[in-house]
């Protein structure tokens, strides 16, 4: 037991040293309004709503230069409701994102953890409900997933370097069902082109 405690302290000390050399950003947003609704079951209603024009969230993102063109990165992000102070998800604290990654300018990016699927992550840039977890702005049928933002647990994401405005990516989510390797697994691929000249 004594050896385990010493090893744990050594690991904590190493983590502290690494953190001191890292770039870590704390970010977030809060959106609260009081809409007046003229007809709710024949009556008027004034209430308090969260995340009307942008999501309520807080998060941490960071990176560390490892040298040789490599960079370690991570993101932790929690969505919540300002009006009642509760998280969006009762089962996952970092319900919007929780991943670690390794970035290379020449080889691309590899990320592991809970990540948004490419459908919502890619199309959200152009949708009228582009702010994820915005319950008031979404497309009919929610076919692009923007109103719900489906993060994929236990997922591996690979993104290619940008090549002349083009970038491709692939995502695989492990189902983690014992004895059924294909159950609950997910696939997602994307290709995107962006250019300042268009």
Locate each region found by the language model.
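Conserved adenosyl
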Residues: 186
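Short helix-to-loop capping/linker segments positioned immediately adjacent to catalytic or ligand/cofactor-binding
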Residues: 177-179, 189
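Outer membrane beta-barrel
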Residues: 21-36, 46-174, 183, 192-196
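Sec/Tat signal peptide C-region and signal peptidase I cleavage site
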Residues: 15-20
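Repetitive helical segments and hydrophobic/amphipathic motifs
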Residues: 11-13, 168
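Bacterial Sec-dependent N-terminal signal peptides
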Residues: 1-8
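Short, Φ-rich (hydrophobic/aromatic) sequence segments
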Residues: 8-10, 27
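An N-terminal domain-cap segment
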Residues: 41-43
């Amino acid at each position: 037991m004594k050896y385990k405690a010493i090893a744990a302290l050594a690991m904590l000390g190493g983590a502290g040293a690494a953190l001191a050399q890292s770039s870590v950003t704390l970010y977030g947003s809060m959106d609260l309004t009081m809409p007046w609704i003229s007809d709710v079951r024949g009556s008027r209603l004034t209430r308090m709503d969260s995340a009307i024009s942008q999501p309520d969230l807080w998060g941490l993102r960071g990176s560390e230069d490892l040298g040789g063109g490599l960079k370690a990165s991570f993101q932790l992000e929690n969505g919540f409701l300002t009006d009642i102070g509760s998280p969006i998800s009762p089962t996952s604290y970092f319900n919007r994102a929780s991943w670690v990654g390794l970035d290379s300018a020449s080889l691309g990016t590899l990320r592991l953890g809970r990540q948004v699927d490419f459908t919502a992550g890619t199309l959200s840039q152009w949708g009228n409900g582009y702010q994820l977890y915005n319950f008031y702005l979404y497309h009919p049928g929610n076919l692009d997933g923007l109103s719900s933002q489906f993060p994929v647990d236990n997922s591996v994401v690979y993104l290619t370097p940008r090549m002349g405005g083009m970038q491709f990516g692939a995502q695989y989510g492990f189902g983690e069902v014992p004895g059924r390797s294909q159950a609950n697994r997910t696939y997602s691929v994307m290709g995107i082109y962006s250019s300042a000249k268009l």
